Design a protein with these regions (language model features):
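Extracytoplasmic beta-strand/coil segments of soluble accessory domains associated
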Residues: 42, 46, 74, 78-116
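C-terminal beta-signal and adjacent terminal beta-strands/loops
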Residues: 639-646, 664-713
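Gram-negative outer-membrane beta-barrel transporters
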Residues: 417-421, 525, 532-536, 554-647, ...
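Short acidic/polar hinge/loop motifs at secondary-structure boundaries
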Residues: 116-141, 159-161, 253, 257-259
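N-terminal periplasmic accessory domains that precede
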Residues: 73-76, 96-99, 112, 127, ...
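Transmembrane beta-barrel wall of Gram-negative outer-membrane proteins
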Residues: 174-203, 208-247, 271-294, 583
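Structural signature of Gram-negative outer-membrane beta-barrels, strongest in the C-terminal barrel
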Residues: 334, 349-364, 398-537, 624-628
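Membrane-embedded beta-barrel scaffold of Gram-negative outer-membrane proteins
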Residues: 184, 284-288, 292-312, 467-473, ...
């Protein structure tokens, strides 16, 4: 870390000597946001210009998503530089797994909506995210434990939803695989406040056999001036019925598809599904006590009744055109309560300070009961039995309760006009109690697992931002160098489907260093950002085969993630409706110290090997021309090089390109017609690996088209 700090200090000194000093007149007075600059909240819990943040931050606007007909979280994030994602995961055919810095673990990232973690203290519940209601997405890379606690220990994605606005909007969508969608929103003045009503109805047959989906969601948002401050309340109701599709079994030594299996065929039990019935209420209140101090409070409760039925084949059991399969049917109920209270304060003391201090509580409970079952699948032709026709093999249940409480403080100090030092610390208390039971049919005794764990640990961060060139006209308008060091921890998530074998694993911890430069050129028409990162991850939870041949979650010792990311954007002043954005990322993600026992091959050492399914090099380019009226068009291309298939890197998956494009016509401020094609090259690459089914991968959806008509009045 001293190397990072020394490099930043030397670079700052040399560059300031070359360009000369150009400090702002008054460091205590916040500068207004420059033209074409993005304001970010997530990185510091207060409004900050992106170039003034000592870290890698990207913002995607909801208007941009709607103009590109985006309705899934994967489509919303896939063109962000360095983000590795795709549609499909253990949690459903429409639910992605998202990777940053080469880390693609489902629970490694914090996902928030309006300041509230979706899923509470458990794994991110991405089905709760309403993509149609997004105002903007803020992606902050690297550990965020200081401000956001144990869930933000490797990076975060925060979604801010739309507030009250004038008028009403209706969008009709139709496309491939019998996809139909209706989205409507209206805004109603209510005294001195405002009321916003919104709803979405979505139907699709799915591209994989027996993966029909129905997604109905709606809500109410109320905003009101109250007690000299601002109060908001958002109620959401979600009813998602998603038939579940199985991943594709692959041979570990070669990476080839197991003979007899085919892409887009569904080998899961007939009746497999991932359903959610969610009710949530989030309230927010902020009040300025003075020009220098503001109070902010967020309170949320969510209740999710689920139906989870999944099954996975045993690739090694293929014989005479059949394969053995096992599955679990559960009805979990998940509750989550979240409360955060903090103050924002600006004051003087050897320079200007912006202080954030507060406390947060996250509580959650998941209770479930269900059955396990075994059956046989016919491969050619496919013959899959219905869930109700399969004998019950065992009964299982679990009760998992988690409580996180943390106090935190973070200070941005400007001792000099050209220097900002940010330091923060957080202390978290974590408690978890787990009870799981399983009983085989015919066995008079049940297997019981009781486990509990308490931890109290610190997270923190220290960073410096050096303003080399500040808000000048001409060729180089702004140049900032930053260096940051951060550390965070989180409790590991048990695999609750393992019944009596479920256990609480060791907490995971990250330590990272980052150095970067952010520049603006040609009167802010051109942006160029460059960052280097290094992160050590201890006790990463991975899936391996247990002694019984079934997948099990284990701690994986130590991993190292390092690399660099470049992002450039160009928006000419003479053609402000045209935007060109591109970037390149180099991610080197490796096991540092990890050995495990394979039931067939014995002790294996993955130390020094790359993490499976993580690309070393990935790049993307997007060109858009989207004027407010008249014709518009856009296209986006992304690429990933070959990726290791297994933990000891015996086989690699081929590199791939993916291409999307769309055209539109805005007839006026009241009507817009658009057509979009995704994965136009029909590349069926792998997007994620199952953490439950051994050596089984989810495949990218095929070429598909979408037409959309939006009416505003």
């Amino acid at each position: 870390m001293r190397t990072f700090i020394l490099a930043a200090a030397v670079a700052a000194a040399l560059t300031r000597a070359a360009f000369g000093e150009n400090p702002p007149a008054d460091p205590a007075a916040p500068a207004p946001a420059p033209v074409n600059e993005t304001v970010v909240v997530s990185a510091t819990q207060s409004s900050e210009i992106e170039t003034e943040i000592p870290g890698n931050v990207t913002v995607v606007t909801g208007d941009e998503l709607r103009r590109r007909n985006v309705h899934t979280l994967a489509d919303a994030l896939e063109d962000v530089v360095g983000i590795d994602t795709g549609i499909g995961s253990d949690n459903g055919v429409q639910v992605p797994t998202v990777g940053m810095w080469g880390l693609k673990e489902f629970d490694a990232l914090l996902f928030m909506v309006d300041g509230v973690p979706v899923g509470g203290p458990f794994n991110p519940n991405l089905s709760q995210i309403n993509v149609d209601d997004i105002d903007r997405i803020e992606i902050v890379k690297g550990p965020q434990g200081t401000l956001y606690g144990v869930s933000g220990f490797a990076g975060m994605v925060q979604i801010f939803t739309r507030t009250s606005e004038k008028g009403s909007h209706v969008t009709l969508t139709g496309g491939s695989f019998q996809h139909g969608r209706l989205d409507a929103t209206t805004n109603v003045p209510l005294g001195t406040g405002s009321l916003r009503l919104f709803g979405t109805f979505d139907r699709t047959d799915g591209w994989q056999d027996r993966t029909d989906g129905r997604d109905d969601r709606g809500g109410i948002r109320f905003d009101q001036a109250l007690g000299g401050g601002h109060f908001s309340a958002v109620f959401n109701a979600i009813r998602t019925t998603q038939l579940w599709g199985s991943p594709l079994p692959v041979d570990p030594p070669t990476g080839e598809v197991i003979p007899g299996f085919r892409v887009d065929r569904n080998y899961a039990v007939d009746g497999a599904r991932q359903d959610h019935r969610v009710f949530s209420l989030t309230t927010g209140f902020d009040k300025s006590l003075s020009t220098a101090v503001t109070l902010v409070n967020t309170l949320s409760y969510a209740h999710d009744d689920q139906i989870s039925v999944r099954s996975f084949v045993d690739p090694g059991s293929v014989e005479d055109g059949t394969v053995a399969s096992s599955g679990v049917s559960l009805k979990p109920t998940e509750e989550a309560l979240f409360e955060d209270f903090h103050i924002l304060a600006n004051f003087q003391g050897a320079g200007s300070h912006r202080l954030v201090a507060g406390a947060a509580l996250t509580w959650g409970r998941t209770v479930a009961a269900g059955t396990g079952f075994d059956f046989t699948v016919g491969l050619d032709p496919i013959d899959v039995p219905a869930l109700g026709d399969i004998p019950v093999g065992d009964h299982r249940s679990f009760n998992d309760r988690r409580t996180f409480f943390g106090i935190y403080v973070n200070d941005e100090w400007n001792p000099l006009p050209w220097l900002e030092i940010t330091a923060g610390a957080r202390h978290d208390w974590v408690e978890e109690e787990l009870f799981a039971k399983g009983q085989e049919v015919g066995d008079p005794e049940a297997g019981v697992s009781r486990d509990s764990r308490s931890d109290a640990q610190w997270s923190g961060g220290l960073s410096g931002l050096f303003r080399l060139v500040g808000d000048k006209s001409g060729a180089l308008n702004e140049a900032n160098i930053y260096v940051a060091a951060k550390s965070a921890f989180k409790p590991a998530a048990p695999n609750l489907t393992e019944a009596e074998s479920a256990e609480i694993l060791k907490p995971e911890r990250t330590r990272s260093g980052e150095i970067g430069v952010k520049t603006r050129w040609l009167d802010r028409q051109l942006s160029f950002n460059l960052s280097f990162f290094h992160m050590i991850f201890e006790n990463l939870v991975v899936s391996t085969l247990g002694a019984d041949g079934n997948p099990a979650l284990v701690n994986a010792g130590k991993e190292r993630f390092q690399g660099m990311e470049i992002q450039a954007g160009y928006r000419p002043n003479v053609l402000p409706d045209i935007e060109l954005i591109g970037g390149y990322a180099h991610h080197d993600a490796r096991y540092v110290d990890f050995t495990f026992i394979d039931p067939d091959e014995g002790l294996l050492d993955a130390s020094g090997q790359r993490l499976e399914l993580t690309p070393r090099d990935l790049w993307n380019v997007k060109l858009a021309w989207l004027p407010a009226s008249g014709p518009g068009a856009w296209t986006a291309v992304r690429h990933q090089n070959h990726r290791p298939f297994d933990k000891i890197n015996e086989a690699y998956m081929p590199s791939f390109y993916e291409w999307d494009a769309g055209v539109s016509w805005s007839f006026s401020a009241h009507a817009r017609l658009s057509f979009v094609g995704r994965n136009l090259g029909d590349n069926r690459h792998y997007v994620a690996e199952s953490e439950i089914g051994d050596a089984q991968l989810y495949v990218a959806p095929p070429r598909r088209f979408l037409g959309e008509l939006t009416l505003s009045f």
